[in-house]
Amino acid sequence: SVFNLSQFIFFVFVCLATIALVSLLFPHLFTRQKKFYPKRVITAFESRMFTRLKEAFPHHHILAQVAFSALITHDQMNMRNQFNRKVTDFVVLDRDYNVLTIIELDDPSHIGKEQEDAERDAMLIAAGYTVIRYTQIPSIRQLQRDLR
């Protein structure tokens, strides 16, 4: 016979040991991949701005991470595709839920993206919104002055 019993047992043992070693070294091969993961809604920097906006405008509604598609639309699909994945940092609403202004908080990740930011602002401005950009968290007084 090609294999005697001891060779067969050794072969099975080596196969099982190999499978065990591969599963230890590469567990992702044997576990089901998660398709969705939770993530933070806003950064720590943005959360400080959110708190400042709530302090500056206690009688207004402050929304964070609002999709452009909730704010603007266009008849042509190719134009909608230009903004359908874009999100604005904050939207300030009055008591009747009308948009007063859109606020963008530019952290250091925006350096070198000034043209892209200008294009984003232009879309919102063309729809009739006011857009205010800050690179630092402004004082309550500054916010109230800017949103008059």
Across the structure, where does each feature detected by a protein language model lie?
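Functionally constrained cores in energy, signaling, and assembly domains
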Residues: L5, R52, H60, T88, ...
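A generic structural signal for short, solvent-exposed coil/turn residues
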Residues: K54-A56, H60, Q82, M123-A126
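Active-site metal-binding core of divalent-cation-utilizing nuclease and nuclease-like domains
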Residues: A64-L100
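Basic, glycine-rich
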Residues: F3-C15, I19-S23, G128-R148
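Basic, amphipathic alpha-helical patches used to engage nucleic acids or provide basic targeting signals
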Residues: T88-V91, R95-D146
